[in-house]
Amino acid sequence: MNLKSASQLTLYGLNDHFNELVSLYKKKKLPNKILLSGNKGIGKCTLAYHLINFILSNDEEFPYDEKNFTINENNKSFKLTINNVNPNFNLIDVASDKKFIDISQIRNLILNLNKSSLNKKPRFVLIDNIEYLNKNSINSLLKFLEEPNDNIYFLLIHNNKRILSTLKSRCLNFKIHLTNSQSAEVLNCILKKKILNNINNELIDYYFTPGKILELINFSNDYEIELENLTLKNFLRILIEKNYYKKNIFGKALLFDLIESFLQKKEFHIQSNLFEYFITKINDVKKFNLDDEIIINEFHEKVLNE
């Protein structure tokens, strides 16, 4: 199942947000520094790609279908974008072999933007996971954002993690939110079936955005894990005891997400003084790139096997 935001032809659930941004653009009031903030997997990046295609395809063949919130796969700008050769589009994200967005990525971006444009169309910079900008990357980006940038739009994707206030203050913040019922509707549209009937409600309650559930489904299919009657606690046991979290990058991210969800359960929070301890340890592992095996084994022993 293809989960890449760039190739999602139809926008689901975020139509009102899209219309608001399009309305600002048509009135020539669209800010050139926009922060799209919300839970990871909610569709912020997909929304950004649709807005970009709407603008770039406006004077091209097979333009964006505004009525049905759909990108035409035959559109020139769409083809250039998914093949990473669109001169009017720059994507910045964490490299597969890195844990943070490196300053070299920002420097190369600035060099590219300082070059003359090949056409008169707007240019777009999409920075995903901006919470992974390191200090040097942020400082370099801030200097460029302070300068006048005619016809260049920055769309920054923020996953509700803490970011530098100086970066946040330079952008107009659009908060993206979906209710559980809206998320369920989005999933049903994408999958063409009611897949949530096959997932334990406890997992849904603690892991519920469309993108995250889709990743969870893919992961469970890869390792033949039945989710229908699986509690959150037992799922954590399986991930750790069978070392599934070591199989790929998503597996480890999934494990830490679910550990945090489990720790934030009200009954656990009240009854255990380990809550703050493990949350602090997990944050330190992520922030300082520490050995995560120690904290995972400790969590398994002190919490899951209590």
State what each model feature region is.
Residues F78-L91:
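Conserved Walker-type P-loop NTP-binding/catalytic site
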Residues S37, L91-S96:
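A short hydrophobic beta-strand->loop->alpha-helix junction that borders the nucleotide-binding pocket
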Residues F124-D128, L141, I152-H158:
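Structural recognition of the conserved hydrophobic beta-strand(s) that form the central parallel beta-sheet
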Residues N19-Y25, N75-T81, D102-F124, Y132, ...:
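Conserved alpha-helical scaffold flanking the Walker A/P-loop in AAA+ ATPase domains
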Residues D97, Y132, E147, R162:
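Residues immediately C-terminal
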Residues M1-F54, E60-T81, D150-I152, N160-E306:
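Charged, glycine-rich active-site and insertion segments that engage polyanionic ligands
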